[in-house]
């Protein structure tokens, strides 16, 4: 009997089972203990393979692939701390709903807690963060193949959103030629190998029912809050709100076109808040809201009903309003709850939104971080997509720009960390093969610098704008102690990114005005390659501009 051969047959059943649930992308890190899984994935023609030497980046690459493909993505890593490096991406997926299947190779039980090399307690190590956890036994022919495949099918059928962690122990030897060991065991699955359906098919319905009193509520004064959603959903939500005559407060990730732009500015005006107090119902579609003023208003508003509609299960309202939590796909929910044509009831808010927009436009000629955020819609590639980093950059775009309705926008706004942003953007590009504009801050770029290796080979133009404000300038917006701010919060690194781009053989530009930036972008969109554009700006100008605009708009 060959242990290595049966390990591979066991792994082949696991990987083949994944194909029956829509898995097409498999992300693989190097490792020895994961050899059975890696070879099974490599030999399965149904998969598109992605490799990366850094497991933390690999997890975020998978996250980006899942965001765009809307299908589960598998990740294969070896045992030990390699597994722990998947934690940040797993946490993000749990909060934003992307389906990740983490196949973590492990030592067999007799090598755990006895001083064996690269052996840690992996079973259950991610605590409550995975949506599903499956700890498989050591491969053995005493367990029928139908148990293995039905166990995988059951776990995937139960995976509504988030990550599935499958821990896979393998005993040595891990290498060797294939022979007939386990062939009969494998063949007992019969024509399943030629089929395309799961061995065990389970139906699970999570969709919310139609709200029978919707005909009553749609005649009331309402407000629509749009959070993270798809491009198609964003267009439908915008039309739905317009028909109802309800003001739409659109997040940067809503893709609604933000018909009332600069919401994070005008929500700081007391007149706007007073008018919103007249709302009898607030309908929030999508989660992960960005704007500080929006979150402050959400925390204090008291409509008769507050509804939250999102495909993700669980509570998504940090203000704990009285109302309804409806689990449904946004497009399906809109179809069940059609709008009734009514005149807009808000008068002051459209006026304030227009005045706020004019104040922002008046400053667009200055070369700076806030102005880039406002101008970003002018730099979007045609029929492309935008990836937005975290910290200050996403807040500036949310507050100062107006992105086109239905234009794909992606970000990691679940846990909102700055780790893995470049890797996630790489996954977004690979899944769509569209021209991609990504914009991050300098610390975010440094945090995931080795992800530039993932951007060496791209299928469409990829532009990475690094806004270098020399540190974490978002802390300039917070009441951090002035004497401690630079050393303990901002942490300026005084670096530039030309050498990093050169190390990975990427194009690089450092424009000093808008004309040079536009020239660099024009050239970048003509070639299927990655271009790094470093925008060096004055340290605190972006934060100060936002604060000045907030003060101006609050007094309109």
From Swiss-Prot:
Q: Which domain of life is it from?
A: Bacteria
Under Enzyme Commission nomenclature, its number is: 2.2.1.9
MF terms from GO for this chain are:
2-succinyl-5-enolpyruvyl-6-hydroxy-3-cyclohexene-1-carboxylic-acid synthase activity; magnesium ion binding; manganese ion binding; thiamine pyrophosphate binding
Q: Give the Gene3D superfamilies listed for this entry.
A: 3.40.50.970, TPP-binding domain
| Reactions that this protein is recorded to catalyse | isochorismate + 2-oxoglutarate + H(+) = 5-enolpyruvoyl-6-hydroxy-2-succinyl-cyclohex-3-ene-1-carboxylate + CO2
Recorded hits in CDD domains, A to Z, give: TPP_PYR_MenD, TPP_SHCHC_synthase
The record's free-text note on cofactor binding: Binds 1 thiamine pyrophosphate per subunit.
Functional pathway: Quinol/quinone metabolism; 1,4-dihydroxy-2-naphthoate biosynthesis; 1,4-dihydroxy-2-naphthoate from chorismate: step 2/7; Quinol/quinone metabolism; menaquinone biosynthesis
Which SUPFAM superfamilies did the record assign? Thiamin diphosphate-binding fold (THDP-binding) (SSF52518)
Keywords (alphabetical) are: Magnesium, Manganese, Menaquinone biosynthesis, Metal-binding, Thiamine pyrophosphate, Transferase
Which InterPro entries does the entry mention?
MenaQ_synth_MenD (IPR004433), MenD_middle (IPR032264), THDP-binding (IPR029061), Thiamin_PyroP_enz_TPP-bd_dom (IPR012001), TPP_enzyme_TPP-bd (IPR011766)
Name a Pfam family for this protein: TPP_enzyme_M_2
Q: Name one GO biological process term.
A: menaquinone biosynthetic process
Give cofactor(s), names only: Mg(2+); Mn(2+); thiamine diphosphate
The Swiss-Prot or TrEMBL record describes its family as follows: Belongs to the TPP enzyme family. MenD subfamily.
Per its database record, what is this protein's job?
Answer: Catalyzes the thiamine diphosphate-dependent decarboxylation of 2-oxoglutarate and the subsequent addition of the resulting succinic semialdehyde-thiamine pyrophosphate anion to isochorismate to yield 2-succinyl-5-enolpyruvyl-6-hydroxy-3-cyclohexene-1-carboxylate (SEPHCHC).
HAMAP family, alphabetized: MenD
Assembly, per entry = Homodimer.
Q: What is this protein called?
A: 2-succinyl-5-enolpyruvyl-6-hydroxy-3-cyclohexene-1-carboxylate synthase
Species of origin reads Salmonella typhimurium (strain LT2 / SGSC1412 / ATCC 700720)
Output the lineage of the source organism. Answer: Bacteria, Pseudomonadati, Pseudomonadota, Gammaproteobacteria, Enterobacterales
Primary gene name: menD
